[in-house]
Structures are given as C-alpha cells and as structure tokens.
C-alpha cells in the first residue's frame, strides 16, 4: 500500500480519555511521522506519551479521530495487520518474557504469526546475533542483567521484522552505560534496517539523538522539530517540568559565569570540541 507523502503514521484530530475520567488525555491531536524517522516523544508524567503509543499499536481505542499505519486505517478489520507492522519494547522487559529460555521466548511471537519452523529457527538465530546475545540462547531470561534483558526484548521485536519499533521508556531502568549501549545498538539497527523508531523517554540526552523531537503537554503537541530547534528553548522546557540536555546545562552555566559562548545548541561532542578550543585560546 502506498504511503501518503511518505508518512508511515498519520494521526488526525485524535482524542482519548480513560474510563471513568472526565478529562481527555489526548486532545484533538494531529501528527504525521515519516517512514524511517527516529522520533522522540517527550513530556512530563501524564502528558499522554505512552497513551499515544498504545493508540498507535491498537492497544487502546480512540474516543474520536483517526489513525493510519502504513496506509491502513486503524479499525477492527485492520488491527491485526497493523500490529504485525509494529514492535514494542517496554520499560520492564520481564513483563514481556513468556519463554523458559531466551530462544523460545523470541520464537513465541513467530509461532503466533504462523512462521514455518525452519524460517523461525533462522530468524531467532539472526536476531540474537544482531543484538550480540547469541551466547545466551539457552539461558533463562530472569537470570540476565537489565541491559541483556532489553537486548533480548529487542531481538524478539526484530525477529518479527516490523516496520515501526516503539520504545516505551525502554532505557529508564538501565544504568548510564547500559542506556548508552542500548541506544547505540538501536541507532545502528535503524540505520541498517531502515525501520521507524518512536522513542518515549524522560532521558533528554537520549532525545537529542533523534531526527525529530515532539513535546507533549496536557495532551497536546506544544513543540515539534529537530533537536537543535527544541533544546535551545531551555526556559520553555523547564517551565513544563522537563530537564535540558547536559551540554545545554554546561552552556548555561558558562554564560552565567561571563564566558563568551555562542548562543546556539551544542551536542555533547560539539560542546567538548568548543571547550577544547576555548582552553587552547585561554
């Protein structure tokens, strides 16, 4: 099915509220996501990020409005075809594990899709190799570290060959090193396999790596753009309870101390380069 203007996801005038609640979590939200983009969804708790992800995957039903995924309208007829196109990795991978060992857990989703056994064995092996977990194929998931569990969860998603991967706070329970390793892995996989990534995160430094950042507040999109255009607006982010990137914190502190630093967005690498040049000149 052909995509409209290259949009893998099209959301129009979407509203949603939970049962027994008067207030809408999402309010007349309209959003298009291009095929192959890495999107970071940021916002404080209760802003509607995870709710939006579950609506895209068909786990929740919208109050009003429409969702299209890969050209398919979200409805009872298409919902299972849509779910085959989406893989979700959650905050706590233990909630996703159903197999006695790693390889049987990854095979579970393939069995549900009726994948022939020979192909299933090949896909499981390939997915484990891609995430660097082939040596743990016969291990119990419960005995793995947090980072290893998330790699297995990602392998389970990759084996299904989705067009969209949704990361719902997938790195929040990892230490900084594990978080960095997992994001690097996903970025490399995205570049190789050309899937779309939607990352729901509280980690602002993680969000800086996205192609596009969408800021949600009170169920509405209040900002949308490239990381450099979003994270230069420090005061606006702080006012809605969000953090700012580490490099921006440094830039703000240097400015307060009277250092003549450009009023522009810096990535961490750019900040390190600027500080090195500044030190050489002074």
Swiss-Prot record:
It is found in: Cell membrane. ATP binds at residues 43-50. The keyword Transport applies. GO terms for cellular component: ATP-binding cassette (ABC) transporter complex. Pfam families: ABC_tran. GO terms for molecular function: ATP binding; ATP hydrolysis activity; ATPase-coupled transmembrane transporter activity. CDD domains: ABC_cobalt_CbiO_domain1. It is a peripheral membrane protein. The keyword Ribosomal protein does not apply. Residues 9-243 form the ABC transporter domain. Its EC number is 7.-.-.-. InterPro entries: AAA+_ATPase, ABC_transporter-like_ATP-bd, ABC_transporter-like_CS, ABC_transpr_CbiO/EcfA_su, ECF_ABC_transporter_ATP-bd, EcfA_1, P-loop_NTPase. It comes from the Bacteria. SMART domains: AAA. PROSITE patterns: ABC_TRANSPORTER_1, ABC_TRANSPORTER_2, CBIO. Keywords: ATP-binding, Cell membrane, Membrane, Nucleotide-binding, Translocase, Transport. Forms a stable energy-coupling factor (ECF) transporter complex composed of 2 membrane-embedded substrate-binding proteins (S component), 2 ATP-binding proteins (A component) and 2 transmembrane proteins (T component). ATP-binding (A) component of a common energy-coupling factor (ECF) ABC-transporter complex. Unlike classic ABC transporters this ECF transporter provides the energy necessary to transport a number of different substrates. Belongs to the ABC transporter superfamily. Energy-coupling factor EcfA family. This is Energy-coupling factor transporter ATP-binding protein EcfA1.
């Amino acid at each position: 099915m052909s995509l409209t203007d290259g949009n893998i996801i099209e959301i129009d005038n979407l509203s949603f509220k939970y049962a027994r609640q008067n207030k809408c979590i999402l309010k007349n939200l309209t959003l298009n996501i291009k095929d192959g983009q890495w999107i970071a969804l940021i916002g404080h708790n209760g802003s509607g990020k995870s709710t939006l992800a579950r609506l895209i995957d068909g786990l929740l039903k919208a109050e009003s409005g429409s969702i299209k995924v890969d050209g398919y309208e979200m409805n009872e007829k298409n919902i299972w075809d849509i779910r085959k196109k989406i893989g979700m990795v959650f905050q706590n991978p233990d909630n996703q594990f159903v197999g006695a060992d790693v390889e049987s857990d990854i095979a579970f989703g393939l069995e549900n899709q009726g994948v022939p056994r020979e192909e299933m064995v090949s896909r499981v092996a390939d997915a484990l190799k891609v995430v660097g977990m082939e040596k743990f194929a016969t291990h119990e998931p419960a005995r793995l570290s947090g980072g290893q569990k998330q790699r297995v969860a990602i392998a389970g998603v990759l084996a299904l060959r989705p067009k969209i991967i949704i990361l719902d706070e997938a790195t929040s329970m990892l230490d900084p090193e594990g978080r960095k390793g997992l994001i690097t892995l996903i970025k490399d996989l995205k570049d190789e396999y050309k899937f779309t990534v939607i990352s729901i995160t509280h980690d602002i430094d993680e969000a800086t790596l996205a192609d596009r950042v969408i800021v949600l507040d009170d169920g509405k999109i209040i900002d949308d753009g490239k990381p450099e255009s979003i994270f230069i607006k420090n005061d606006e982010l702080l006012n809605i309870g969000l953090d700012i990137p580490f490099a921006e914190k440094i830039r703000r502190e240097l400015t307060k101390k009277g250092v003549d630093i450009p009023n522009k967005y810096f990535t961490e690498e750019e900040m390190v380069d600027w500080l090195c040049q500044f030190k050489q000149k002074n």
